[in-house]
Regions:
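Extracytoplasmic/secreted envelope proteins and their assembly/folding machinery
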Residues: 96, 100-104, 110, 192-196, ...
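Surface-exposed short loop/turn segments
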Residues: 27-49, 54, 110-160, 178
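C-terminal motif of bacterial Sec signal peptides marking the signal peptidase cleavage site
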Residues: 22-25
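A structural "domain/chain start" motif
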Residues: 27-96, 206-214
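Bacterial N-terminal signal peptides that target proteins for export
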Residues: 1-15
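Short secondary-structure boundary motifs at beta->alpha junctions and helix caps
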Residues: 82-90, 160-201, 208
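Generic short beta-strand segments
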Residues: 63, 132-137, 171-172
Length: 214
């Protein structure tokens, strides 16, 4: 390779390096100016302990999300039924994991069951609770403060013979007091707690009936 060719090659390498640095600088600038993400956590409602302890263990499998709900994003329905999400806001985990954890916490809080655990626990269980997330969104299509809707389809069955003993929908709704994020999250929590209270009550009723007849 002659001297001229080496000079051209060296100049090209320098130009490429400068271009890469410029791109990296732009990307860094974009990241530094991006809106920070705020993570919101929901709390399970305190549940009054049951007067009767059922000698059964329940396993709660990871909730199954309906289309659009397999995300950590906080969803909102806009005009024309457009499913969107609140920018700069998220749940601490994927929504199915959030719902599953809250359902387990609520059932444990009832103090009516020998044990309640998730599908990862290496323990045996007598019953299995399956949850499908049908609704978990804020509806802002009306233009005012959003209304939050939560609907969980539940199937409860025995583990030994795979017999379904109950199917029901646990639902809740709440209107945000204002069109701001803190009020929307408060409405999410209220609607979720309503739905989980129904889930706990219906689950315990079904277990009480099944254990008394078997």
């Amino acid at each position: 390779m002659n001297r001229a060719a080496r000079a051209i090659r060296a100049a090209a390498a320098v130009a490429a390096a400068v271009a890469l640095l410029a791109v990296a600088g732009c990307a860094s600038g974009l990241r530094s100016g991006a809106e920070p993400t705020v993570t919101y956590a929901l709390r399970a409602a305190p549940v009054a302990g049951s007067a009767k302890l059922l000698d059964v263990a329940v396993r709660v499998d990871r909730a199954v999300p309906a289309p659009g709900f397999a995300s950590e994003r906080i969803l909102v329905v806009r005009e024309d039924r457009r499913l969107d999400h609140y920018s700069g806001s998220r749940w601490p985990e994927m929504l199915p994991d959030v719902v599953t954890a809250l359902a387990i916490e609520t059932l444990r809080g009832s103090a009516a069951l020998t044990a309640v655990h998730d599908q990862r626990a290496p323990f045996t269980s007598d019953y299995l609770l399956l949850i499908t997330i049908r609704h978990f969104e804020a509806d802002a299509s009306g233009g005012g403060a959003p209304q939050v809707r939560v609907a969980l389809e539940c199937t409860l069955g025995r583990r030994d013979d795979r017999v379904v003993i109950a199917t029901f929908t646990a639902a809740g709704s709440a209107s945000a007091s204002a069109n701001r994020m803190s009020a929307v999250i408060a409405a999410y929590e209220a609607a979720t707690q309503q739905a989980l209270a129904v889930l706990s009550t219906r689950t315990l009723e079904a277990l009480t009936l099944d254990t008394s007849t078997n």
